[in-house]
A protein has these predicted regions:
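Glycine- and charge-rich intrinsically disordered segments
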Residues: 172-182
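Polar low-complexity intrinsically disordered regions
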Residues: 2, 108, 122, 181-182
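Metal-dependent nuclease catalytic cores that hydrolyze phosphodiester bonds in DNA/RNA
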Residues: 1-72
Length: 182
């Protein structure tokens, strides 16, 4: 039993390492740098998808901080879409199965919404967001899931609830929180 669980932990570690390497290769590509050998099979399909979708990446690996709500994170990209909406894009490596679509995990739209608010100050009427899923089991397979302003607004509300719960459980108060004082 111990041997099997060690193997499972190794698989998780290997998957995380591959995801990190794919992210690094994508970052290199979009900065105009050399893509590490062996990663073109992941990078090229993503580049083609982004071009086909009319997405223009404006900033890469951007650290975002929301001091009033008390959270921070690093987004993969800030972008403009084909109709001029600004948004947040995050790459996700994922094991996929042939014929089954990539669907966001529950927290992924919340992450995009939180980054939108940290970057732009709110979920504006022209906000957009997307996750680009890169298959680690079907080389060359990439899919995009886009989020509308309505979806981002709902995800932001969910994120705020989760953040409030986390802050309560951890006894954390944002240093610049502008809420009521008791």
């Amino acid at each position: 039993m111990l041997f099997r669980s060690e193997g499972a932990f190794q698989q998780v570690s290997d998957a995380a390492d591959l995801g990190t390497a794919i992210h690094s290769a994508l970052e290199a590509h979009f900065k105009g740098e050399q893509v590490p050998e062996g990663y073109d099979a992941y990078v090229y399909p993503v580049s083609c998808l982004i071009e086909r979708e009319g997405i223009k990446l404006l900033e890469h690996e951007l650290r975002l901080v929301n001091t009033s709500d008390g959270y921070a994170g690093t987004t993969d990209a800030v972008f403009t879409d084909s109709i001029g909406f600004n948004g947040i894009l995050d790459f996700k490596s994922r094991k996929t199965k042939p014929g089954q679509p990539c669907t966001p995990w529950e927290t992924e739209p919340m992450q995009i919404a939180a980054y939108c608010v940290a970057k732009f100050g709110s979920i504006r009427s022209n906000a957009t967001g997307a996750n680009v899923y890169i298959s680690t089991t079907e080389k060359g397979r990439v899919e995009i899931v886009k989020y509308s302003t309505t979806q981002l607004d709902e995800a932001w509300n969910a994120f705020q609830a989760a953040l409030t719960l986390w802050q309560y459980l951890k006894g954390y108060k944002p240093p610049f929180h502008e809420g009521p004082t008791h």
